[in-house]
């Protein structure tokens, strides 16, 4: 057994890799992905998809996702981005549409390179992106249609100042109390940039600060 138990070097896969048994091909990685990841409306996969959408918009989707990292996304500009997602519709039967709530709890950080956790509980990002799959017709729900998403962007310092120990926040409270910037997918780069620089864009910039 190798004495090296450090982190694996994860390389990005293409989906065409073979699944083998005794030298015989029994499937492909893409088959597994289709089997495991096709339900994009459940909480787990929707959350991962939301991270990917934000990373893609910010030019940070190169490489692979790190599970349980201290922040969800690190951009080429060195911005640290935390991504949260919510939706009115779920893949299971619902008596009513879900109430929209996002997790904002400070947390201890975990380092994948060392396998150790920090005892300090805090929010480590520069900015939060709250991703709302706002579509409300179950028959036409499609998480891959980015017109069905709305994004709210907020500097982390505002959460630290206004909600220092709060663990979750309703959409109504987020909008009314904290005034995040609201944008569509195309506007994410400018909106995140504005928030990381601690600025609100001037009127007519194409961004929509909520009142």
Where is each model-derived feature located?
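Nucleic-acid endonuclease domains
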Residues: 1-79, 83-211
């Amino acid at each position: 057994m190798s004495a090296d138990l450090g982190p694996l070097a994860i390389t990005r896969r293409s989906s065409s890799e073979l699944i083998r048994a005794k030298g015989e091909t029994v499937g492909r990685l893409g088959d597994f992905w289709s089997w495991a990841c096709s339900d994009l409306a459940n909480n787990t996969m929707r959350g991962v998809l939301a991270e990917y959408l934000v990373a893609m918009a910010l030019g940070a989707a190169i490489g692979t996702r790190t599970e349980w990292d201290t922040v969800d996304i690190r951009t080429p500009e060195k911005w640290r981005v935390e991504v949260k997602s919510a939706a009115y519709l779920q893949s299971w039967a619902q008596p009513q549409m879900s109430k929209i709530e996002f997790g904002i709890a400070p947390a201890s950080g975990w380092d994948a390179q060392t396998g150790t956790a920090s005892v300090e509980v805090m929010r480590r990002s520069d900015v939060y992106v709250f991703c709302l799959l706002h579509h409300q017709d179950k028959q036409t729900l499609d998480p891959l249609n980015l017109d069905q998403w709305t994004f709210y962007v907020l500097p982390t310092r505002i959460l630290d100042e206004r909600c220092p120990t709060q663990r979750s926040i309703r959409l109504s409270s987020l909008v009314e109390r904290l005034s995040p910037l609201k944008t569509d997918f195309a506007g994410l780069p400018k909106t995140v940039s504005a928030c990381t620089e601690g600025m609100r864009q001037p009127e007519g910039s194409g961004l929509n600060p909520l009142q």
